Amino acid sequence: MADGYENHAPENLQGKYQAMVVCCILGIGSLFSWNSMLTIADYYYQVFPDYHPSRVFTLIYQPIALGTIMILAYRESKISTRKRILTGYILFTISTFLLIVLDLTTKGHGGIGHYIVLCTIVASFGLADATVKGGLVGDLSLMCPELIQSYMAGSGMAGALTSVLRLITKAAFEKSNNSLRKGAMIFLAISTFIELLCVILYAYVFPKLPIVKYYRRKAASEGSKTVVADLAAAGIQNLSDLSDDDSKNQMLRKKELLLQNIDHAVNLFLIYVLTLSIFPGFLYENTGQHGLGDWYALILVATYNFWDLFGRYAPLVKWLKLENRKALTIAVLTRYFLVPAFYFTAKYGDKGWMIMLVSILGLTTGHLTVCIMTIAPNGYKGPEKNALGNLLVVFILGGAVVGISLGWLWLIGKKYAF
């Protein structure tokens, strides 16, 4: 490590809370468009009743995101973080706007052609997700834990916000013609605005915050090349004072980083296998008919999102933060008792039990994810933290792909399942 850089930022360094707010907004933007797609799934089920939109969208989205992040994680040390993240948010903005254009062009009618174009736009969301998520997790991993926690909390907040907006729009337009479509259009317009806001914040605000400049200079002093464009955007052109001594910048290879953190990687994989095998497809298609009617699935999704958000903020309370690696593994494995619990509750239980199980699923997903993502980078140099962050995102998306695929098993035995 270059002289003059300590393990922690000076206490009087300005911009920490501003950076936390920006990271939270960036986290919202990284998932808001996709969560909007999931939350307005009731509209797409109305337009495409025979095509399982929620399951198909996730089956398209996640494998593309996984394939993209695997390529980017392999090449992360040679890719400008700034260009990568801005490209992702710009792609989110354009793709979300195209959903509005598509719906206006087709006037909300179904058809296989409309569905194929819709699935193509969903694929672009997967590409944007991997570009943004891996880049930001890697970038924030080399900074203080509060920033990555704020980003992860923002990701959870995206789900909570979309659920609130969906419930409001459904209630507001319930008695009007094309109520679902009107609500969906409002959603997509808000999503487009949020993604554009993220482009502006990351391009012009975030790189100029003192705490961000400090950690990026520190990473550059440890041999990171991915932060050079960000430092230039902050007005730092002369990096001659940073260390170029290779003897001081010996870094672990990706394989070594993965072996040292294999438990964290596998735990993240298992978390998202379980979560995505249940959410959202099971909640839309396997929870039966209840007195709440078509509000039921929306309430379940909202419940998951709110408890997921709560779980992501819980580690801010020190005694609630799990840091013991064995305890984390036990907690992750214990969650798998939820599988039979969901099965029997869907078959024999009432809505109260289902809401409780969904709450547990959301709470544990958010809490365990943030605990792992904040403790994993500890003790590594900046470039190693960036590489590790990208690797962990690979396992998150890998778990999501497997979970989505396993989610189709819930349809076995159902009439008109396929």
From Swiss-Prot:
Keyword terms of this UniProt record: Cell membrane, Membrane, Transmembrane, Transmembrane helix, Transport
Main location: membrane
Induction, as annotated: By nitrogen deficiency and 5-fluorouracil plus methotrexate.
Tissue expression notes: Expressed in leaves and at lowe levels in stems and flowers.
GO molecular function, one term: nucleoside transmembrane transporter activity
Any GO BP annotation: nucleoside transport
Transmembrane spans: 20-40, 54-74, 85-105, 108-128, 147-169, 186-206, 264-284, 291-311, 326-346, 353-373, 392-412
Subcellular location per the Swiss-Prot or TrEMBL entry: Cell membrane
InterPro entries referenced in this protein's UniProt entry, alphabetically: Eqnu_transpt, MFS_trans_sf
Topology in membrane: Multi-pass membrane protein
Any single GO CC term annotated in Swiss-Prot or TrEMBL for this entry: plasma membrane
Protein purpose: Nucleoside transporter that can mediate uptake of adenosine, uridine, guanosine or cytidine when expressed in a heterologous system (yeast).
Family: Belongs to the SLC29A/ENT transporter (TC 2.A.57) family.
Protein name stated in the entry: Equilibrative nucleotide transporter 4
Organism: Arabidopsis thaliana
Taxonomic path: Eukaryota, Viridiplantae, Streptophyta, Embryophyta, Tracheophyta
